[in-house]
């Protein structure tokens, strides 16, 4: 691992931290559940995207950029999508309306997460491109006695799997009550879940051995992870809310279809998010999308930069609940404003930060160490380069703000005027110009020309 400490990650499957040992160090594989593209992603959705982006970056640093495969899916077949399509595009044929909804939502999702400084995953499969793979797994499950056909549906028989519930660690009856699973007369057991359901003439559907229909939610991720990562892979991630039933049912499907002991060796889950101390919901009036936060004044009466949202998320450990607030965003913004805009060059990330990340992705300690490095970077060029390399690893590399040419010319003129005032020993006027520029976010740096020894002043836009 090239000087890195052992990477320890908390495994929901075992309820303990474990040293990460990839199945194949030349191809480290991670799957994270992506968005269902019926509505713009909200700030709660942003948390797993950011958390697992940091892990992706860390794995690439440790094992090499070409030796990590990160799959994050797009769920583009779902009853919520159908309902949104009918609501938003009542004049279009359903398939066209669905396409209009999913394409617009997926495009917005990509734009949003790019503004949060997230790398693109190695592969981003859509559910609709993997229907054949889903039906193949379902056929296997029927063939080996883990699934059955009833009332036009294919259902997974939860009692057929001796250790069903290994992830949530709860008795089956308790799981069903907690997840409010509907009890249908055609089910063998109340906890049995749908693998395939028939579609009416006005619903999207695909031909299958069980008639024209569409997949259940859980089978989608089993099929896509199998196709791109194999029967067993290294890490599966998502939010706490996905442990049951989604991830539990993924495990059941995949293990029973492929005859494996596990689906993924490590299961990671990020904590819940509240907004100003309350659960986020449309009924509470505190539902905030990523797009709204970045581009409207809906939260705190202003727009917030993507890097502020990213840092605000990383200032809480990924396993802990997070109270998302204006105060938290302001704190993150103040911190970012103190960080220099420097280039990493050939520098390596800071060892203290790497140690923190290797300790179950402790971004809280990592951010604290990064801030200390930023303070040193103001006077130490070597620390500056190391800071930039470390910030880049976290997806927090400060960017120099762009400025209009006309504004730049005006700043140049004021800087030149200040130099004239200094030459004339009119320090009061020179200070006035400096203060005026500082108030507008322009930072001046005085120095000497190496050849002539004359005073020179450079400037940059502060963050």
UniProtKB/Swiss-Prot annotation:
<keyword id="KW-0030">Aminoacyl-tRNA synthetase</keyword>
<dbReference type="GO" id="GO:0008270">
    <property type="term" value="F:zinc ion binding"/>
</dbReference>
<dbReference type="Pfam" id="PF01406">
    <property type="entry name" value="tRNA-synt_1e"/>
</dbReference>
<protein>
    <recommendedName>
        <fullName>Cysteine--tRNA ligase</fullName>
        <ecNumber>6.1.1.16</ecNumber>
    </recommendedName>
</protein>
<feature type="binding site">
    <location>
        <position position="250"/>
    </location>
    <ligand>
        <name>Zn(2+)</name>
    </ligand>
</feature>
<dbReference type="InterPro" id="IPR014729">
    <property type="entry name" value="Rossmann-like_a/b/a_fold"/>
</dbReference>
<dbReference type="GO" id="GO:0004817">
    <property type="term" value="F:cysteine-tRNA ligase activity"/>
</dbReference>
<keyword id="KW-0547">Nucleotide-binding</keyword>
<feature type="binding site">
    <location>
        <position position="282"/>
    </location>
    <ligand>
        <name>ATP</name>
    </ligand>
</feature>
<comment type="subunit">
    <text>Monomer.</text>
</comment>
<dbReference type="InterPro" id="IPR015803">
    <property type="entry name" value="Cys-tRNA-ligase"/>
</dbReference>
<dbReference type="InterPro" id="IPR056411">
    <property type="entry name" value="CysS_C"/>
</dbReference>
<keyword id="KW-0479">Metal-binding</keyword>
<dbReference type="InterPro" id="IPR032678">
    <property type="entry name" value="tRNA-synt_1_cat_dom"/>
</dbReference>
<keyword id="KW-0648">Protein biosynthesis</keyword>
<feature type="short sequence motif" description="'HIGH' region">
    <location>
        <begin position="35"/>
        <end position="45"/>
    </location>
</feature>
<feature type="binding site">
    <location>
        <position position="246"/>
    </location>
    <ligand>
        <name>Zn(2+)</name>
    </ligand>
</feature>
<dbReference type="InterPro" id="IPR024909">
    <property type="entry name" value="Cys-tRNA/MSH_ligase"/>
</dbReference>
<dbReference type="GO" id="GO:0006423">
    <property type="term" value="P:cysteinyl-tRNA aminoacylation"/>
</dbReference>
<dbReference type="GO" id="GO:0005524">
    <property type="term" value="F:ATP binding"/>
</dbReference>
<feature type="binding site">
    <location>
        <position position="33"/>
    </location>
    <ligand>
        <name>Zn(2+)</name>
    </ligand>
</feature>
<dbReference type="GO" id="GO:0005829">
    <property type="term" value="C:cytosol"/>
</dbReference>
<keyword id="KW-0067">ATP-binding</keyword>
<keyword id="KW-0436">Ligase</keyword>
<keyword id="KW-0862">Zinc</keyword>
<feature type="binding site">
    <location>
        <position position="221"/>
    </location>
    <ligand>
        <name>Zn(2+)</name>
    </ligand>
</feature>
<dbReference type="Pfam" id="PF23493">
    <property type="entry name" value="CysS_C"/>
</dbReference>
<dbReference type="InterPro" id="IPR009080">
    <property type="entry name" value="tRNAsynth_Ia_anticodon-bd"/>
</dbReference>
<keyword id="KW-0963">Cytoplasm</keyword>
<comment type="similarity">
    <text>Belongs to the class-I aminoacyl-tRNA synthetase family.</text>
</comment>
<feature type="short sequence motif" description="'KMSKS' region">
    <location>
        <begin position="279"/>
        <end position="283"/>
    </location>
</feature>
């Amino acid at each position: 691992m090239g000087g890195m400490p052992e990477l320890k990650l908390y495994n929901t499957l075992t309820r303990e931290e474990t040293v990460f040992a990839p199945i194949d160090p030349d191809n480290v594989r991670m799957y994270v559940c992506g968005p269902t593209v019926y509505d713009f992603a909200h700030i709660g959705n942003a948390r797993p995207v950011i958390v697992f982006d940091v892990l992706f970056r860390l794995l690439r640093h440790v094992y090499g950029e070409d030796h990590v495969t990160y799959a994050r899916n797009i769920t583009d077949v779902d009853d919520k999508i159908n309902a949104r399509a009918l609501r938003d595009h009542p004049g279009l044929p359903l398939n066209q309306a669905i396409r209009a909804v999913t394409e617009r939502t997926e495009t917005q999702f990509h734009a949003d997460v790019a503004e949060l400084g997230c790398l693109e995953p190695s592969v981003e499969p859509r559910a609709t491109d993997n229907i054949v793979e889903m039906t193949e797994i379902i056929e296997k499950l029927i063939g080996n006695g883990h699934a059955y056909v009833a009332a036009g549906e294919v259902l997974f028989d939860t009692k057929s799997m001796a250790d069903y519930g290994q992830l949530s660690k709860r008795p089956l009856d308790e799981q069903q009550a907690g997840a409010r699973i509907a009890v249908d007369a055609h089910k063998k057991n109340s906890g049995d879940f749908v693998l395939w359901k028939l579609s009416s003439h006005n619903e999207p559907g695909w031909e299958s051995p069980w008639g024209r229909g569409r997949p259940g939610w859980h089978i989608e991720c089993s099929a896509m992870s199998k196709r791109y990562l194999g029967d067993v892979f290294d890490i599966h991630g998502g939010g706490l809310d996905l442990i049951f039933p989604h991830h539990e049912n993924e495990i059941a499907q995949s293990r029973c279809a492929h005859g494996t002991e596990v689906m993924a060796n490590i299961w990671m889950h990020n904590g819940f998010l509240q907004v100003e101390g309350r659960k986020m919901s449309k009924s509470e009036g505190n539902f905030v999308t990523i797009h709204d936060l970045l581009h409207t004044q809906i939260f705190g009466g202003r727009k917030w930069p993507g890097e502020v949202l990213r840092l605000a998320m990383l200032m809480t450990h990924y396993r802990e609940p997070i109270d998302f607030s204006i105060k938290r965003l302001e704190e993150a913004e103040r911190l970012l404003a103190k960080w220099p805009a420097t280039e990493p060059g050939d520098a390596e990330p800071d060892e203290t930060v790497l140690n923190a990340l290797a300790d179950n992705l402790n971004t809280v300690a990592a951010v604290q160490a990064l801030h200390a490095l930023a303070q040193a970077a103001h006077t130490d060029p070597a620390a500056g380069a190391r800071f930039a390399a470390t910030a880049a690893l976290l997806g927090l590399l400060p960017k120099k703000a762009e400025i209009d040419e006309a504004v730049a010319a005006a700043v140049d003129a004021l800087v030149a005027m200040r130099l004239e005032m200094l030459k004339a020993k009119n320090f009061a006027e020179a200070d006035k110009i400096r203060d005026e520029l500082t108030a507008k976010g322009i930072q001046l740096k005085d120095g000497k020309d190496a050849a002539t020894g004359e005073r020179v002043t450079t400037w940059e836009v502060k963050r």
